[in-house]
């Protein structure tokens, strides 16, 4: 298992390994806007081309992976940002009662794209149908689109200094011609450049501890608590409190001396890293003070600070005199926090490894620096393989994902090296449907459309005698009742598992315990019978003894 980094510049695209020196270039790749590249599972890479109404599709896995363009998808107009809404990891077959894993050729449910004017497109990828177009999603260009909570919600940010949270079902609903956002955040005063969502997520926003971090050119970082969005019960119970059930709660605001371009969070939500024109800085969200005291910066300090949140100012450690714990306590009392400088460069994009130990920093010179967070040392620098470094431009997209080493530990297999099948001239026969330009009329019930979808392999072999709740609920209840009675049996249960021909044969000692119980019951019955017989014999003996004693007395 290794990690690969995918980054694009104004004139090139590169795929490299984080822990090795393997590297390849993507052909005919040109981007000018950030977040214009999105990875579709572990198979495809979508890149919106600069100054062209076109999406280039690259194949990154299997025996068909290539450096050249796999497929081109024409668009109604030029797109700036891309995002996909993935399918769930397991699909349930109601007829067979079997869970199916996702197949190799698996397309996401939705593809979202934005334009320079703030228009939002929503396509269904399995059919290519244009489900909806939101003409004025933002007043200006959208800077980022992200789906959260398994695609239930969509978050967009734009140059109009707003962050909008949408519900996915509203965007794709055929009966909703003009979808309304769930909430709008307009605390920033300049364009919002980036945002990140915490890793602590659940099924719905109202029952999770999801936090949203937004950064802007106004040199501020704002953290919101999204757990109160859409909570109607809390809204009715607290009608006087405007912070409940309507908009996210602003937990904290961090001000910096520089305009912020990018932000990335630690996988465990312990720290955040921001990229500016003056370098990359790290901020610990669990701030350490004198001794062993640690302060949670995202915890509300009181009732009066719920609406506006706490405000902190970030200062560099090297600008302090000494930088000891006593200075940190004094600065914290004044609302100032000390942040570490990771790298001095003009940062354009940031990304972090899956274990949170490495920080990938993309700059305006077209280079990606891999830095160790603990030591703040540059491990290696990745550049585009080209002869003219001056024309590369800045890093516009930066992605990381794990992958398995296959085919002799080759990261990427070029078109000339790969052993392609003899059929179809070595090309993948599974193609992505073309994206339509006209909105699908969902109100016409007789208007049907085809969806090409491949079903994966069953997740596991199921026992035919095993009742499922969707098939036979009464039988399922009886089965659960039997299992509960077995596991609640008095005494310890010791199981012996034997593996024969890759099949598990489990024999439990419950049967032997039941046999022992029957023997004990039978023994108790026998003992009672013997006791009763003994009492009768004793009574007879006492009577005979009394008669014998009387006969002796008469003599």
UniProtKB/Swiss-Prot annotation:
Residues 460-504 are annotated as: Interaction with RIX1. WD repeats lie at residues 29-68, 90-133, 137-176, 187-234, 255-296, 342-383. GO terms for biological process: DNA-templated DNA replication; pre-replicative complex assembly involved in nuclear cell cycle DNA replication; regulation of DNA-templated DNA replication initiation; ribosomal large subunit assembly; rRNA processing. The modification Phosphoserine is found at residue 388. One of its GO terms (cellular component) is nuclear pre-replicative complex. Component of the RIX1 complex required for processing of ITS2 sequences from 35S pre-rRNA. Belongs to the WD repeat IPI3/WDR18 family. This is Pre-rRNA-processing protein IPI3. It comes from Saccharomyces cerevisiae (strain ATCC 204508 / S288c). The lineage of its organism: Eukaryota, Fungi, Dikarya, Ascomycota, Saccharomycotina. The gene is IPI3.
